[in-house]
Amino acid sequence: MEKYNFKQIEEKWQNEWKSKKLFKVKPKKNKKKYYVLEMFPYPSGKLHMGHVRNYTLGDVIARFKYSNGFNVLHPMGWDSFGLPAENAARENNVHPKEWILKNIDTMKAQLKKMGFSYDWNRELSTSDKNYYHHEQKIFLEFYKKGLVYKKSTHVNWDPVEECVLANEQVIDGKGWRSGASVEKKLMPQWFLKITKYAQDLEQSLKDLKFWPEQVKTMQKNWIGKSKGLRINFSLDNKEKNIEVFTTRPDTLFGASFIALASEHPISKEYTKKNKEVENFVKKCQENLNLQEEEFEKLEKIGIKLPFNVIHPVTKEKIPVYIANFIIMEYGSGAVFGCPAHDQRDFDFAKKYSLNIKQVIKPYENIKLEKAYTGDGKLINSDFLNGLNVKEAKEKISKFLIKKKQAKTKIIYRLKDWSISRQRYWGCPIPIMYLKDGTAVPATDKDLPVTLPDDIDFSKSQNPLKDHPKWKYTKYSKTGEDALRETETFDTFFESSWYFARFCSPNSKDIIEKKEAKYWLPVDQYIGGIEHAILHLLYSRFFTRALHDCGLLNIKEPFDNLLTQGMVCHKTFKDEKGDWVSPVDFDEKKNKEKFLIGKSEKMSKSKKNVVDPDLILNKFGADTARLFMLSDSPPEKNLEWTDTGIKGAYKYLNRLWDLVTKNLNILSKEKKCSSKCTVKKASFI
């Protein structure tokens, strides 16, 4: 009996698929399409087991759909711009392009060895000018639509990467990649108006029937819809008024002060009139450089302005402060303080001996030693007395709106997307500056704006800024001298539309409409839940923006979303406390010399990774794929064990033996071997 020779078998069938061009696909009117896509990888050098699991899940779905008569699109490409390539260039004295291309060759060979059903004719790389040429066109389309603008703002600055981060790239006050504590810095930045789509992005989440609830909840919370009122408080002895935003109009009768942001127009007005106010405002604006967590921990302080406002119902006079805990970006930059029912207001009122008036009584008799923020019955609130919080909100809102003292208002936590990055290895922003400083978009004749190859990383973190020639150009419309924008796109720009480019990767158009109409949306998308807010939200925004530019006929990019679990492995430390690779651990021989830690996500830093090449060479691709599919549900973490992979290998051997022993029963033809041929290659 012939033994299970996985190398011979896998090589045979992979060559068969290649020669028959089995996975090459094009639109077919008489066949129903199915588009399977796994999040494409950054070409870091080698595949890891997380990749293997992700791509195995996608591959089995693709093959299943093909076997059920679908016309299956299953592409692969490379998210190849980004900081790691630039850092590698600095450390190893190699050009980022060279480093990336070498890594792509290595990883592509690994993927082919795994036997995945990719249509390699559609392969794309985001650092290829044929890709980012069209990306620059997209930027200019967005520019025409008014979705692009530039302004100076306090941005998230990663001191390690020396680069700006979007709000979504700051996790618990630290850079998502470097882990460094992020600082705030005032800088001019290019932005995309994702906030224009905030309402649609939030409301449409309910239509994503086949997305994990956890992902939808994360996006909903990040978009952060708040429904409230804008209430007018008139200034005493003046015709002006202060517009205050609140989500708690039920507490209006407990208002004892108004707090303004340091950037509020009235704050700026009094800065010019009073030196003490000017100094306080400067101090407040320094605090804007802090991360959100640090900002919240600040002592709540303020400075009183020389006027009051009139309460819209009771007509009582209420003092006005500039306060360090109010920001202009939220609401109207002004709030009314109700100390009894907001802890921040409570702390402020205590400090400045302001009135603390309770207007909500808890259902249970409890002693209030701090602000009460729960439900209850309204007290000390005139015509609201006896109502619960919800009823009180509705009644006071109707009252104020009828009196034309308030308007309903919906605001969102979501901020516009900062896309400027102070790095070389990214897509150049197609903007140039004329002598008078005017920013003008590049014309079609100017595209693509390509990166220079002759760069010097020794001078600064951004070689484009210091390049002796590259930044100097001509504005093609007038022929006058101009300077190129020396910043590049956030790399999430590239990954926000690649799924659409896969439909026609070689087209001269940004997106070939006929192909896109046939293939999109993606029927099954697969990737980690860590991308819930970043990539997945940006892709939803891009799809809407591309739709509004007339480039797509869909608004949602992905019908079904599978967020696969991580591949985990036990961790090991030696007697010194240093991480040790599982390869160096032998439980029978030297268990006493090692500390066995908990199972964690595979990572190079903890040395608990398993090299896919070792598994492929020892057990074969089918064994690796079988283990990835059989040991844990796709959404759950998969525990990597030697016994598990060996068990999958033994199972395939038994399956091979079962079939080869009974070939005379299964087929009338003579005994088949791994060297036999078939009349037609099969997708599965």
Placement of each model-derived feature along the sequence:
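Conserved active-site neighborhood of enzyme catalytic/cofactor-binding cores
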Residues: Y42-L73, I171-W176, F253, E329-K361, ...
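Amphipathic alpha-helical
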Residues: Q14, I194-S226, A261-I303, D444-Y475
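Conserved catalytic alpha/beta cores of large enzymes that bind or transform nucleotide phosphates
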Residues: V281-P306, V359-E364, F383-K390, E394-K402, ...
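Short, solvent-exposed turn/loop segments enriched in Gly/Ser/Thr/Pro and often Arg
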Residues: K29-K31, F40, P75-P84, E123-Y131, ...
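Conserved oxyanion/phosphate-binding beta-strand-loop segments in alpha/beta enzyme cores
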Residues: M1-L37, Y66-P75, E98-K108, F210, ...
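Residue patterns forming the tRNA-binding/recognition surfaces of aminoacyl-tRNA synthetases
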Residues: K3, K12, E16-K20, E91-I242, ...
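Non-catalytic terminal extensions that flank enzyme cores
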Residues: M1-K46, Q189, L201, Q214-S226, ...
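Catalytic alpha/beta core of large soluble enzyme barrels
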Residues: G58, N71, H264-L368
